[in-house]
Amino acid sequence: MNKANSLEEWIDAMRMRSIISFNGVFADRKDNIFFLHNSSSPLRKEGIDWKNIIDGTRSDLVWNEYVDFEEIPQIRNPSSGWIASTNQDPFKVTDANDNLNPADYSPTLGLQTRMTNRAYRSIELFTKYEKIGEKEFDAIKFDNRYSEQSRSYKYIANLFDREFETKELNYGIDVLKRWNLATDFENTSAALGVCVLSSEWISEQGQR
């Protein structure tokens, strides 16, 4: 990968499938950008719900090959001019008009559809600007907000219409309602917000 002198050489290196699971993003001085959902999916029988328990007595369900490199999600030079990859749904990595169509890919690939807060914020910020200079790029890079589309915010928002028995809890809800979802040092609402969010994060990771 590091020895590649062109996009084609980089793609050839990735075609080796030596480092799977990590998404790949390429950019060069010729204004090429490329996204690769770097998975290695089994070539499975169609028409089977592979998310559920599979009949282990059927030899026709045993797979012995992997899906070809060309069949995994990849985007080359989207017209939007940007790609944002943060461990998210491979069909939501650039502007909506340039994203791949999930219907073009077999469900047997088992592609993830999870969206992270970083993914939501990256897309929101990149689509906000028609042109991105150094100032705008720094603002995107050092953004410290939660997205209202994120699981994290929705977890907190579920509390907004609830009435609690104590003044302390109701005051806490008011603090969360006033929070602008930023986590800068001076933000006095962030401490409670992030503390509440920790339970959602642990739950998502399957630790509780």
PLM feature segments, named:
Residues 1-16, 122:
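Alpha/propeptide regions of enzymes that mature by internal proteolysis
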